[in-house]
Amino acid sequence: MLVSLALDSYPAEVLSRPSLPAQRFAVTLLSAAQKMLAGRFAAEGRPSARLALDDVPHVRGSLSGALIPSEGLAALECSVARRVPAGDHLLVIASVIGVPYTAETGDPLIRFRGRYPVL
């Protein structure tokens, strides 16, 4: 998997840390019904993941130790293979080491040009 992150973003800061536990993280594919949750994580000065997920059902990934919302379309636990600076972004190349869940139905949350279009 490849993730492209703005260098000045909180996720880039976290994934750049050499102390990241076992160099592992999780990605949740959110459903169209989870715009509010996406907004919490996208906001500047946002609280920690633990606080952002305070009123949202979640689990701790067994392989990554990351907090994972329970109601997305899918969750992936990943291990960092390589970090590549690319202009004003950081590319994180990772191996998927686990798939805690996938949903049977649901529409994905997509952000395009600052909006959430419906497919």
Predicted region positions:
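Basic, polyanion-binding surface patches
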Residues: 1-119
